[in-house]
């Protein structure tokens, strides 16, 4: 699954 998803936003860099 992609990093910038509803389950994982910390991967987005926020």
UniProtKB/Swiss-Prot annotation:
Superkingdom field: Eukaryota
GO cellular component: extracellular region
One Gene Ontology molecular-function label: toxin activity
Primary site of residence: secreted
Cleaved signal peptide residues: none
Isoleucine amide: residues bearing it: 14
Keywords: Amidation, Disulfide bond, Secreted, Toxin
PTM text: Contains 2 disulfide bonds that can be either 'C1-C3, C2-C4' or 'C1-C4, C2-C3', since these disulfide connectivities have been observed for conotoxins with cysteine framework V (for examples, see AC P0DQQ7 and AC P81755).
Tissues in which the UniProt entry reports expression: Expressed by the venom duct.
Keyword Transmembrane helix included in the entry's annotation: no
Compartment(s): Secreted
Protein family according to the UniProt entry: Belongs to the conotoxin T superfamily.
Domain notes: The cysteine framework is V (CC-CC).
Protein name, UniProt field: Conotoxin tx5c
